[in-house]
């Protein structure tokens, strides 16, 4: 069974502790894809929900001291119930505080994967690239950045940009699909973190396969959305992207995938 079919069959509960700007978009995107999102932010509630969850997303976009404590509590509970947790270290290269939080979560808690743009992941491993907060483009060595992070942290890494790279156990693949409209809609990267959290726990020992499918589904859905009437406009693209996540099939992935 393909990873996409498995996701739709299991409809995993995915707990999303994400930033305030993107909660609605993230929830709708996961529902369209076939997962079951919950945007819980209270430790006692997390204790109840994570027992049944298939994944946890920690997105540090809306960062406060209290949220830092929440991330820590959620990761402790996730480890207790063996729930795979994905970290999206939003803008961790933009300042010392964000970097400190990201380093703490990576070094002191169990993570199943890290998803970030080239600038974010590069900052975690001490590689200099040109980036601006949550935006990163035109990076040529994205596969090297992914491999460096995978080697340093010994967990799967997803690095996004004009080309995306996935590194698992020292092996790297690059994804050459995607839409230029994605950076023009706030929250597309954050939703991707939740999609990664939806796929990462589907098949133990098959993380590279699951992550490759997650990236292909996401990026090809973006291509489909851009090709639709007025898909070149951000407002229309946002709606059509959700529609494409709902409609995309394994046949679409097989026909349009560009992987190296």
Curated annotation (Swiss-Prot):
Name the UniProt key words of this record, in alphabetical order.
ATP-binding, Kinase, Magnesium, Metal-binding, Nucleotide-binding, Thiamine biosynthesis, Transferase
Q: Which InterPro entries match?
A: Hyethyz_kinase, Ribokinase-like
Protein name, please? Hydroxyethylthiazole kinase 1
Residues given in the record as substrate binding sites: 39, 187
Q: Which organism is it from?
A: Streptococcus pneumoniae serotype 19F (strain G54)
Q: Which residues bind ATP?
A: 115, 160
Source domain of life = Bacteria
| Catalyses which reaction(s) | 5-(2-hydroxyethyl)-4-methylthiazole + ATP = 4-methyl-5-(2-phosphooxyethyl)-thiazole + ADP + H(+)
Q: Which SUPFAM superfamilies match?
A: Ribokinase-like (SSF53613)
Q: Which gene encodes it?
A: thiM1
Fetch the Pfam families from UniProt: HK
**In the Enzyme Commission scheme, what number(s) does this protein have?**
2.7.1.50
The family line of this record is: Belongs to the Thz kinase family.
